[in-house]
């Protein structure tokens, strides 16, 4: 599972997911990509499940890039604990995804195979996505 090696602070504010992704909205490494259509948190477990699903489906051919990294710690208080007494301990790591962000990319496989691999990955995510090719990836600037 992906997680940062070191962090400056153990706990982070919840934050707000407003606006569109200005960076990382183009397919830049591979030929095909999976682009987010809505904001959300993608956990390190979800990212790993997507990676495994895609690499198993494309077998030996092709290369997969993961364009997001879970760098935000999410805290959780123990079960049946009264409110107060401070913030809970870090439980999991998430990547904050905004609409337009390309999360995964594939190269070296046919369009049909890439599309089915991306749909397998999309089923593991908690955000709506769409399949994009390098030439038709939409940038949200302006």
Curated annotation (Swiss-Prot):
Query: Which Gene Ontology BP terms does the record give?
Result: translation
Which PROSITE patterns does this chain map to? RIBOSOMAL_L16_1, RIBOSOMAL_L16_2
Q: SUPFAM superfamilies annotated for this entry? A: Ribosomal protein L16p/L10e
Q: Name one Pfam family in it.
A: Ribosomal_L16
Gene Ontology terms, MF aspect: rRNA binding; structural constituent of ribosome; tRNA binding
Q: Does the keyword NAD apply?
A: no
Q: Does the keyword Acyltransferase apply?
A: no
> Which key words tag this protein in UniProt?
Ribonucleoprotein, Ribosomal protein, RNA-binding, rRNA-binding, tRNA-binding
One cellular-component annotation, GO: cytosolic large ribosomal subunit
Coiled-coil positions: none
**Description of how the protein assembles with itself and partners:** Part of the 50S ribosomal subunit.
Stated role = Binds 23S rRNA and is also seen to make contacts with the A and possibly P site tRNAs.
So what family is this one in?
A: Belongs to the universal ribosomal protein uL16 family.
Q: Which NCBIfam families does the UniProt entry name for this protein?
A: rplP_bact (TIGR01164)
Give the PANTHER family listed for this entry. Answer: 50S/60S RIBOSOMAL PROTEIN L16 (PTHR12220), LARGE RIBOSOMAL SUBUNIT PROTEIN UL16M (PTHR12220:SF13)
Q: What is this protein called?
A: Large ribosomal subunit protein uL16
Gene this chain is encoded by: rplP
């Amino acid at each position: 599972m992906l997680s940062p090696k070191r962090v400056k602070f153990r706990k982070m504010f919840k934050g707000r997911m407003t606006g569109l992704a200005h960076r990382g909205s183009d397919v830049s490494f591979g030929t095909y990509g999976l682009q987010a259509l809505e904001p959300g948190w993608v956990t390190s477990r979800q990212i790993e499940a997507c990676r495994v699903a895609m690499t198993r489906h494309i077998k030996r051919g092709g290369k997969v890039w993961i364009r997001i990294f879970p760098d935000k710690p999410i805290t959780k208080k123990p079960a049946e604990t009264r409110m107060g007494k401070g913030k809970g301990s870090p439980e999991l790591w998430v990547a904050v995804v905004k609409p337009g962000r390309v999360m995964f990319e594939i190269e070296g496989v046919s369009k049909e195979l890439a599309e089915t691999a991306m749909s397998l990955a999309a089923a593991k995510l908690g955000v709506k996505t769409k399949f994009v090719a390098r030439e038709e990836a939409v940038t949200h600037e302006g």
